Every structure is written in structure tokens, then in C-alpha cells.
Amino acid sequence: MAKAIPKKGSRGRIGSRKSIRKIPKGVIHIQASFNNTIVTVTDVRGRVVSWSSAGTCGFRGTRRGTPFAAQTAAANAIRAVVDQGMQRAEVMIKGPGLGRDAALRAIRRSGILLTFVRDVTPMPHNGCRPPKKRRV
Amino acid sequence: MASSSLANFLSIFTPFKSPPPQPTKAPPSHLSVSTDSSSNNKSAFAPIVTSNNSSSSSSSSSCSGDLMSVVCPSLAYANTLYFRSAYNVQVIVEDNEPEEKLLGRFRREVMKAGVIQECKRRRYFENKQEEKKRKHREAAKRNRRRRGPFRNFNDDKTESVNKKRDDDNDNWEMPEDSPLN
């Protein structure tokens, strides 16, 4: 059974429209875990524009968690949006990990104007029970 | 800064509520009561650096929030809607700040807030024994730093004085107006 999709002009062509979208101000989210670093660039509302991670940059295994990998991931992500015309950005850093400083450094070096740098690591107010200790 | 942010918010938000009957002067304190030491809520307005853990407002613009609550009550808390995410640490970047300085400042703030320490602690479960040990260690570290350097000089003196005072309060002897004296 076919659902009647309401015909709106923009609906059918939303794919191509998104790539042309120009945003002067955006938010860069850096999720730095112990094993990897993911850099996502979104607009101020949170809609993702582009992303890159240490894994997609070609590093695998233990090398993904290194600060150098974080640096390349950040550089990759920024390069994709700079040509879209983003000038200012906020940075939100999440998680412990070696990639925090390195990615921030790379963002700074890429020439984007930073307004805030925030740490948004989620902190439970003693919520869920974490997994048991590893006995290695 | 208040006017520019006001213009920003006017373009995005239309005033969705009629001006409330009594405009409150202070911005709403959406301060979550938290037991963690890492989520300290210092709402002092430092122009350069703020570290906060508020559930809906960033108090870096607490000053302009006050102003806006007087100027336009319905938009006074538009700031709180804008920055909806809670953050642990916020560093405001100035123009042309050298990279190392920014990084150093950020790192220092994070260390002050204890974010990474907290994260590592919460990775795996720690039972009551572990928790007690950790608290003991932390307390020792804190007290050692504060009282360590002074202890060596005044230790004997204060101890002896205290002992004397204790003895005096003990009422070993009969009171002076007793018939037995």
C-alpha cells in the first residue's frame, strides 16, 4: 500500500539543497574517547553538516586514540566546512581522551574564529551503575 | 553586548508570552543541586573565564540577563533557551589569543573542575571499599597540602598547651568552698 506523501516543492529535492546550505556560524563537537576521536560539525541548531573521525582518516586500532589522529580528524572536518563559508564556531568537547587538546589545537590553527570552548562531558548525578571492574 | 544579543534573539524568537505581571530582576536559578565536587557552581561573572554547571543558563551573560529582564521581560530568559546544553567548563575566546594560551587556559579550567578525574572514576563500578579508600586518599591529599608546611614548627608547642588546658577542665580537685579543704 502506497502512502500518500504530501507533495511539497522542497521535499523531493532536499538532498541537493542541503549541500548548498551556507552557514556562517556553527558548532564543532569533539567526542574524545579513549579509543577514538569523532569530530562533527553542525549548525547552531544541531543539524549535522559534516563529520570526520580518526577511524575514517585511515588510522586503525590503537592508533585511533592518539592525539595525532585527533588532529587529522579535526583538520579533515574543518576543511569540508571552510569552503562552505563557515567563519565562526563554538567548540564542544565531550569525553576524556587524548584527542581533546590536539583537536582543539588543530581547529585553532585552521583559522576558524572561535567564540566559546566548552566542555560538555556528561556527568551523572550518581545515576546508572557502571560496568564492573576489569580484571586484567 | 546586551543590545546585540537582544537583536539576535529578536530575529529568532518572537515573544511567545505576554510580559509577565511582575518582571523579576534576577535570572532564574536553574541550578541543579549536585553532590559532585566537579560540578561546582560559581556564578561569579568573570569577563574572561567562567566555569559552570547549570541546567539551562549560561551565567557568562548573567549581567546582560539582568538588564534584559528589566528591558524586555519576555525575552529576558531567551538566553536560557538558546544555551540549552549543560556544560562543565566554558572558556570564552578573545580575539587573537595565542593558541597555547587558550589551550593552557582550557586545560587549567578543566583540571579545576576535575572533569577527567571524574570520568575515569565513573568508568567502572567501585564498591564501598574502593570508595572509602579513594575518599581517604583525597582527604589526605587535601589536608596534607594545607597543613603540611606549618606543622613542623608549632607542633610541640600547641600540643603541650592543649594538654594543659584539658587537665584544667577536668575538675580533679574539690571546689574551693567545700568543707573538706
From Swiss-Prot, chain A:
InterPro entries: Ribosomal_uS11, Ribosomal_uS11_bac-type, Ribosomal_uS11_CS, Ribosomal_uS11_sf
One annotated GO biological process: translation
GO cellular component terms given for this protein: chloroplast; ribonucleoprotein complex; ribosome
Subcellular location: Plastid, Chloroplast
GO MF, any single term: structural constituent of ribosome
Keyword tags: Chloroplast, Plastid, Ribonucleoprotein, Ribosomal protein, RNA-binding, rRNA-binding
PROSITE patterns: RIBOSOMAL_S11 (PS00054)
Pfam families recorded: Ribosomal_S11
HAMAP family hit by this protein: Ribosomal_uS11
NCBIfam families: PRK05309.1, uS11_bact
Family: Belongs to the universal ribosomal protein uS11 family.
Subunit structure: Part of the 30S ribosomal subunit.
PANTHER family to which the protein is assigned, alphabetical: 40S RIBOSOMAL PROTEIN S14/30S RIBOSOMAL PROTEIN S11
Record-given protein name: Small ribosomal subunit protein uS11c
Organism of this sequence: Guizotia abyssinica (Niger)
Gene for this chain: rps11
